[in-house]
Amino acid sequence: MNHDINEEKTEQPTEHHIKKFRKKGETRYSRELNSLLILIFGLSNLWWSRYSIIFELKTIMFNSFNFNQNILTNQQNISLNFFFFIKKILIVFFPFFSFLICIIIIPPILFGGIKFNFTSLKLNFARLNLLHGLKKFFSFQIFIELFKTTLKLFIISCISIFYLWIYFYKILFLSTKNISSSLLDGFNVIFYCCILIILGLIPIVILDVFWRQWSYYKKLKMTHQEIKDEFKEREGSPQIKARIRQQMKINLRRRMISDVPKADVIITNPIHYAIALKYDIHKMNAPKVIAKGIGATAMKIQKIALKNGIAIIASPSLARALYRYSEIGQYIPGPLYKAVAEILAWVWKVKKWKREGGIFPEKPKNISVPSELNVTGESND
């Protein structure tokens, strides 16, 4: 039997691997979502306080352009007046920037937790490697980021130009109004333009959130070799070994159950054992066991098979032999080829019957199992 070594990251990550991954500062939180939240809440804050901001700005502008000879002849008065205006500007925008800082900090903490990553501060000469830098520069991740940035720039430009073109004359005639009306109308023009930009960016943010989730979990996945290496690294503690073994069993069982819909046939005991077989004549040298179980697991395999329209056939001695002498992901033992071939031939006849109709093919009877593989010692079913 051939055993292909597959080094693709197909295994679910262990708890230890997830912790190490998070320590590196990796997170599934979308920066695009954070930017959108900043824009939404920042604009909302400006909208709620627009009248007070406009009033204070009008006061500052009026006092700034008001000519006063006493101020000009006294240098101290000039300094005091300057700091007075600075203070007024800070008072006007302090609530806005305070709220904005909270929005910048709080969402990443809620979604990703508090992380202090000092790894990037360490001196690493490998970063000076030109080939490594070029490889990173032309990576798929960089391409995705470039595509997102270009798309955002295109959307923002189109919306801004279109909106300003529509309201061109309204903006042009702002200079003919009094200062209060001009500031308020100008604020409204900018605000509604930003609302349209937010609506245009929402699809990009949604796609980025799903992309971040998929990319994060893809990076988290491990190869068989990584799991073995981690097990060797941490095998000093019996509790950790037991926990890792348990996690590996859970991961294997989940993957096994998810593979059941791919099976061609389920061979059962009928209630104590269930073995799911798959055979691709173009890709496989022999039928392969993709799932097996006893008790509750066997019943679950049969339930999934019924739900997906997979053929189920009862052959107690063959089911016991396959369970005992076969491993998940491996080909069946050579001595069982003949027995399994009879069942697969029946499965193919059933598939043909479903397509063309006619007489339903009779199930194979007296499926023989070699005595050396017969678990209970019976010769036939």
Swiss-Prot record:
* Primary location group: membrane
Q: Which residue spans traverse the membrane?
A: 35-55, 89-109, 153-173, 187-207
Localization annotation: Cell membrane
Protein transport as a keyword of this entry, yes or no, is yes
Q: Where is the composition biased (Basic and acidic residues)?
A: 1-16
Provide this UniProt record's keywords sorted from A to Z. Answer: Bacterial flagellum biogenesis, Bacterial flagellum protein export, Cell membrane, Membrane, Protein transport, Transmembrane, Transmembrane helix, Transport
Q: Where is this region: Disordered?
A: 1-21
Q: How does it sit in the membrane?
A: Multi-pass membrane protein
Cellular component GO terms held in the UniProt record: plasma membrane
What family is this protein classified in? Belongs to the type III secretion exporter family.
Output this protein's name: Flagellar biosynthetic protein FlhB
Which organism's genome codes for this protein?
Buchnera aphidicola subsp. Schizaphis graminum (strain Sg)
